């Protein structure tokens, strides 16, 4: 085996293998994004004796104190079950970094530490062997965190395993609320379409509304546009919406049908108890439809014919479709826009051969007092599998300068208080 810099083509060909479980940050499109942020990029990998790439990683070189912080965001990409390969990569990476002005290196591999069911019952053993291997190479583990951290990627995820399933069989695994709300969205006639680059402000409007409502930390407009600009068809932006003209027409047709059936039954003499109960039930349905019709007509008059309900940003790579971020309208929540969007994207996975639908981030704190308990409950209702990643690893390369860097950082933090 040999450790070497890779070409973009070598890197891209390697990470296209879905068995490597790579992340959307470890794709060639991210090179341009990192460079637009002002960072140099280097692709570092391992080739076997037949010159085939067996490990690869996109590193950002972040200028710091006359040196560089080397950061592999969700890398390196390799088969981490091959501990011999991991050992070789880390050993050779250390040699490379000592020769290339590295202050310290940060790795946060997209690899599992443990898997749980939706109720946090363990399904696999802990991957301590991998964590200990990193530590044996002098890496500090950031810990098994159970909260969001702005300096780290999420360490917990909710994932749907689609392999061997169909939309119908998968839906049977959802809880009653998920099934009911998906059905509501379908009955309302909610539609989903993908936004073009020129329409991305429709996503941002819903995202900013959700940000203001929930208080969650958010990304800048430029952050999103950077992905839209560079990721091409690897970024998907669905919009769930309702066309009130179509919905009102459907309601009116349904109302007319029920009124006609009620009138036909009322015209009959000597009605049975069963018929009287049916008439009473139709009267309830007619009253409900009239209220819905009035509300929809008023909304059309005040808010327009098209109501934008929910939107999201997704990344698709060789491994999975990943829900990155989203927003929804609280005013129109009765139409179940988020459910329509997720159900549409789950079906997109089936239609395009993906075996994983990743709802993505969770804090790892699954108690009722956690900051994202509502998010967990939402994802839990889809019968997700909870995946815990192994976390962040740091290693100082220039130890003297690294000590000085940390000392100055502590002083700056004290002065801010």
Curated annotation (Swiss-Prot):
GO cellular component, one term: cytoplasm
Keyword Acyltransferase carried by entry: yes
Predominant cellular place of this UniProt entry's protein: cytoplasm
GO molecular function, one term: aminoacyltransferase activity
Keywords, comma-separated and alphabetical: Acyltransferase, Cell shape, Cell wall biogenesis/degradation, Cytoplasm, Peptidoglycan synthesis, Transferase
EC number, as in UniProt: 2.3.2.18
Source domain of life: Bacteria
InterPro entries, per database record: Acyl_CoA_acyltransferase (IPR016181), FEMABX (IPR003447), PG_Glycine_Bridge_Synth (IPR050644)
Reaction(s) catalysed (UniProt annotation): MurNAc-L-Ala-D-isoglutaminyl-L-Lys-(N(6)-tri-Gly)-D-Ala-D-Ala-diphospho-di-trans,octa-cis-undecaprenyl-GlcNAc + 2 glycyl-tRNA(Gly) = MurNAc-L-Ala-D-isoglutaminyl-L-Lys-(N(6)-penta-Gly)-D-Ala-D-Ala-diphospho-di-trans,octa-cis-undecaprenyl-GlcNAc + 2 tRNA(Gly) + 2 H(+)
UniProt subcellular location: Cytoplasm
GO BP terms: cell wall organization; peptidoglycan biosynthetic process; regulation of cell shape
Gene3D superfamilies for this protein: 1.20.58.90, 3.40.630.30
PANTHER family xrefs: AMINOACYLTRANSFERASE FEMA, LIPID II:GLYCINE GLYCYLTRANSFERASE
Role description: Catalyzes the incorporation of amino acid(s) into the interchain peptide bridge of peptidoglycan, using aminoacyl-tRNA as amino acid donor.
Annotated family: Belongs to the FemABX family.
Protein name as catalogued: Aminoacyltransferase FemB
């Amino acid at each position: 085996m040999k450790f070497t810099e890779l070409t973009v083509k070598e890197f891209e060909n390697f990470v296209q293998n879905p068995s490597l479980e790579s992340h959307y940050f470890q794709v060639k499109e991210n090179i341009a994004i990192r460079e637009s942020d002002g960072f140099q990029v280097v692709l570092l990998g391992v080739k076997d004796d037949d010159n085939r790439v067996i490990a690869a990683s996109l590193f950002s070189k972040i200028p710091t104190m006359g040196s560089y912080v080397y950061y592999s965001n969700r890398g390196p990409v390799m088969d981490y079950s091959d501990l011999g390969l991991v050992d070789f990569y880390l050993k050779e990476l250390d040699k490379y970094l000592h020769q290339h002005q590295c202050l310290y290196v940060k790795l946060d591999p997209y690899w599992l530490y443990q898997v749980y069911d939706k109720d946090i019952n363990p399904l696999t053993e802990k991957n301590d062997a991998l964590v200990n291997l990193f530590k044996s190479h002098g890496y500090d583990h950031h810990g098994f965190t159970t909260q969001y951290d702005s300096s780290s990627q999420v360490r917990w995820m909710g994932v749907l395993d689609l392999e061997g399933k169909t939309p119908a069989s998968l839906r049977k695994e959802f809880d009653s609320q998920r099934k009911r709300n998906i059905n509501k969205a379908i009955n309302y006639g909610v539609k989903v379409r993908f936004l073009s680059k020129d329409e991305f402000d429709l996503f941002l409007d819903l995202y900013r509304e959700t940000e203001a409502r929930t208080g969650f930390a958010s990304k800048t407009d430029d952050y999103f546009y950077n992905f839209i600009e560079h990721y091409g068809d690897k970024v998907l932006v669905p919009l769930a919406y309702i066309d009130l003209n179509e919905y009102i027409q459907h309601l009116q047709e349904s109302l007319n049908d029920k009124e006609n059936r009620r009138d036909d039954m009322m015209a009959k003499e000597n009605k049975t108890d069963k018929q009287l109960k049916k008439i009473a039930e139709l009267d309830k349905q007619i009253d409900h439809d009239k209220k819905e019709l009035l509300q929809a007509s008023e909304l059309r008059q005040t808010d327009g014919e098209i109501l934008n309900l929910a939107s999201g940003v997704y990344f698709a790579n060789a491994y999975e479709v990943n829900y990155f971020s989203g927003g929804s309208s609280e005013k129109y929540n009765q139409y179940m826009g988020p459910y329509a969007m997720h159900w549409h994207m789950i079906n997109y996975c089936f239609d395009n051969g993906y075996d994983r639908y990743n709802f993505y981030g969770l804090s790892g704190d699954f108690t009722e007092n956690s900051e994202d308990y509502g998010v967990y409950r939402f994802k839990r209702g889809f019968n997700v599998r909870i995946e815990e990643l192994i976390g962040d690893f740091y290693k100082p390369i220039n130890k003297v300068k690294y000590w000085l860097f940390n000392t100055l950082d502590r002083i700056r933090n004290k002065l801010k208080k």
